[in-house]
Amino acid sequence: MTERKGMEEINREEFQEVVVNIGRVTKVVKGGRRFRFNALVVVGNKNGLVGFGLGKAKEVPDAIKKAVDDAFKNLIHVTIKGTTIAHDIEHKYNASRILLKPASEGTGVIAGGSTRPIVELAGIKDILTKSLGSNNPYNVVRATFDALAKIKA
């Protein structure tokens, strides 16, 4: 299936998706407990386009599907210089801080938790990252995306 993003066509088949987090919330009712799920998903084509989305539903697969649809609505283009990023950048979102540093070729992706799938799906091959402060998956993903969007060639 193809979608339009700005002036370019987006082919969903060339994108990969990674589920970063699945959360469960419980509502206690007279008959017992009712569960609902939320899913945080990152999609990317390993060529500079990457997006994230949050989906909520009564079943996990439905939440993931909604999150993927949301991720395609939030695609950003990441500026990649060779196999890494152009310069150091630090960004804060709520209580999460993320530090991204360019790395020399052959270093690989040194990232943890929620940051790793984002930089891998963006197509960055060599990068050093450090997550500081809160490790809430949504906040870390949002801080990483905001930082990658601010990188200038």
Swiss-Prot record:
One of its GO terms (cellular component) is small ribosomal subunit. InterPro entries: Ribosomal_Su5_D2-typ_SF, Ribosomal_uS5, Ribosomal_uS5_bac-type, Ribosomal_uS5_C, Ribosomal_uS5_N, Ribosomal_uS5_N_CS, Ribsml_uS5_D2-typ_fold_subgr. GO terms for biological process: translation. Keywords: Ribonucleoprotein, Ribosomal protein, RNA-binding, rRNA-binding. Gene3D superfamilies: 3.30.160.20, 3.30.230.10. The N-terminal domain interacts with the head of the 30S subunit; the C-terminal domain interacts with the body and contacts protein S4. The interaction surface between S4 and S5 is involved in control of translational fidelity. Part of the 30S ribosomal subunit. Contacts proteins S4 and S8. With S4 and S12 plays an important role in translational accuracy. Located at the back of the 30S subunit body where it stabilizes the conformation of the head with respect to the body. This is Small ribosomal subunit protein uS5. It comes from Helicobacter pylori (strain Shi470).
